[in-house]
């Protein structure tokens, strides 16, 4: 037990993230500012201090579902390490990431069936959404039928890559004009949340529709000349030169 403070301090200060930040006048970098720390071994607090924040038994509930606990300096006390998960669950924070992921998956699947289709669940997207929410609630939104005239990829890409939505498909694999998103919160006022998400997606799809229609005004052959104006790499010519080399290589591989 005497070794734990030093070990925990070393672990926390050695963590790496793709993007980090500094705050106040500290040189320490972390993924987000540290506001409080819970470090327990059984009933005892493991003493650790980072950027002036000392470890203790106090945590906070969900930012929106239990705002008083977030604003109140007293917070909620976790009496021992074994109680950590349940105390936070009682305050609308689902700590178990595996349970949270499977809850999201099941909510998305069930809601898609209710809407007359089935959800296309990308595992990478599911993993990302899992770490964006503490108390997941799935909800369904819609978009105008006219956008279904776009290629499937033009609809799914802004849904998945930009908005973190799950597409809803028919039995034949074609898209329904619906999507499922996951809210970090409860079931109150879901229609308001859905409306906001629909508005954002509508703008994305309108952009996709515009660029798709603009691209169709010219055949692909008409765009070849533009490849000459884009550099590929110093000493290796432009994108047209690269394309021609690929044509020759493909011909040689195919026909010898």
Per-region residue spans from a language model:
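Inter-helical turn/loop segments and adjacent helix faces that build the functional surface
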Residues: 115-120, 212, 253-256
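Short, glycine-/Ser/Thr-/acidic-enriched flexible segments
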Residues: 28, 42-46, 52-55, 171-173, ...
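Long, basic N-terminal domains or extensions that often function
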Residues: 1-148, 155
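Catalytic nucleotidyl-transfer cores of nucleotide-processing enzymes
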Residues: 120-244
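A general alpha-helix detector
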Residues: 107-111, 226, 249-252
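Histidine- and acidic-residue-rich, metal-dependent catalytic cores
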Residues: 243-256
């Amino acid at each position: 037990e005497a070794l734990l403070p030093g070990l925990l301090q070393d672990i926390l200060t050695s963590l790496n993230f793709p993007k980090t930040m500094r705050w106040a006048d500290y040189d320490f970098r972390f993924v987000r500012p540290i506001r409080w720390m819970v470090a327990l071994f059984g009933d005892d607090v493991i003493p650790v201090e980072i950027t002036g924040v000392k470890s203790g038994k106090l945590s906070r509930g969900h930012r929106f579902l239990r705002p008083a606990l977030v604003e109140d300096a007293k917070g909620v006390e976790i009496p021992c390490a074994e109680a950590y998960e349940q105390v936070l669950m009682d305050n609308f924070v689902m700590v178990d990431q595996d349970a949270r992921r499977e809850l999201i998956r099941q909510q998305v699947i069930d809601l898609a069936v209710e809407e007359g289709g089935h959800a296309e669940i990308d595992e990478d997207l599911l993993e990302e959404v899992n770490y964006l929410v503490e108390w997941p609630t799935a909800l369904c939104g819609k978009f105008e039928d006219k956008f279904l005239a776009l290629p499937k990829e033009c609809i799914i890409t802004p849904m998945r890559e930009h908005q973190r939505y799950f597409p809803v498909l028919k039995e034949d694999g074609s898209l329904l004009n619906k999507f499922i998103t996951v809210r970090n919160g409860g079931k109150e006022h879901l229609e308001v949340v859905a409306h906001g998400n629909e508005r954002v997606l509508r703008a994305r799809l309108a952009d996709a529709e515009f660029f798709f229609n603009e691209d169709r005004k010219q055949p692909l052959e008409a765009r070849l000349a533009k490849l000459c104006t884009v550099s590929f790499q110093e000493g290796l010519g432009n994108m047209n030169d690269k394309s021609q080399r690929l044509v020759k290589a493909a011909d040689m591989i195919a026909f010898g």
